[in-house]
Amino acid sequence: MAVSAALGEDRLYDDQRVVAIDFMEVQPRDIRRYITPDGRNPFAEWLSSLRDLNAVVKIEQRLDRVRLGNLGNSKSVGEGVCELKVDFWPGYRVYFGQFGSTIVLILCGGDKSSQEQDIRKAKEYWKEYEERENAN
């Protein structure tokens, strides 16, 4: 069965049938980085500690895709925090919280070996951030 699609159209032609496709609208996101009450940026500190510049580039490229609206391989890890997987050895992760559908707050990063403690730290950061925002 031959299937073809024309760019910019929302229909696929499957032999003699026309099938309508419901495309999801991609929503660009504003990325912000969490700053602790004492002025530290945990994500920037982690990123600058990486010795592999290729890893830094891969992580920044992954965040660029998030800016364009593509969360890709990500999942909730609970308490409002999500994990964004970066497809690069040794299994880098970026942890974030999200406000609505357009604002992403980058909390911290890590890799597979430190995943459990990174998730705990990200949850602490998210909780502190929400409390600080609600107090204002």
Predicted regions and their residues:
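Basic, Lys/Arg-enriched alpha-helical interface segments
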Residues: M1-P90, G100-V104, D111-N136
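Short beta-strand motif preference
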Residues: R93-G97
